[in-house]
Amino acid sequence: MSAQIINGKEIAEAVRQEISKEVQQLSEKHFIPGLAVILVGDNQASQTYVRNKEKACKDLGMHSVLIKKPADLTQEELILSIDELNQDESIHGILVQLPLPGHISEKAIIEAISPEKDVDGFHPINIGRMMTGQDAFLPCTPYGIMVMLEHIGYDVEGKHVVIVGRSNIVGKPAGQLFLNANATVTYCHSKTKDLAYFTKQADVVVAAVGKRDTITSDHIKEGAVVIDVGMNRNDEGKLCGDVAFDEVKNKASYITPVPKGVGPMTITMLMKNTVKSAQKALEQRKSAQKS
């Protein structure tokens, strides 16, 4: 068998059309969703990500602000900038582009962002809400994975999902979202002994470790769904994921490519979260006016 390719770019475009309608509805009420991105230093990859976010905002008719800060900025100065954005009513989402310089604590910066404007879904309050099944801003990559599976009509209830990776950004929250959707979840990581023993049992494998060829055809069972979150370069300098795509696609039922797989979904869900924040802000304004 040859797997069906899950085209993240096409699914992201379909989701963006829905978001565009929501932005239009808000703009008719003279309310424009606003996203502020803080970029510290001049990391080239970070600059590319930020440009993509700015373009997505512009394409959807959203307001975006880019705040560039030097790499020698102090942690206190960065927190002051975040505080200003927390108070700014025209901004509904705040994102500090990671990674940060070594002298700045990512944990402290994430916690400085108001949970109501934490559209990355990294704040401990949003993580706690997600874990307890409450309404929350969901981390964008795991959120995008769930939306992709929904779009192809794949129901994860009762399925065994193996997450390879345990980062706070992808691995851990992805497992939680699958658990919330009634899947049985197993986590594997760098200290897992005999990775294939676990992944071969999986109906769904999510590879999120940042190391190419982590998942080969020997790691999956026939007909598994394979989601590749990795972003690496091969020997020719071409983008590739954590999955040995060419061999795994002949055994899987569905597989995401790299690029044009999970990547486009991440920024799309960031836009979705920002619009959701704006909708909540408008509701709060209406409630305040009534009272």
Stretches found by the model and what they are:
Residues M1-F31:
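Positively charged, low-complexity intrinsically disordered leader regions
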Residues K107-H123, I127, G230-A281:
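Rossmann-fold NAD(P)-binding glycine/threonine-rich loop
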Residues D42-E54, A136-V225, K238-D246:
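Glycine-rich phosphate/diphosphate-binding loop of Rossmann-like nucleotide-binding domains
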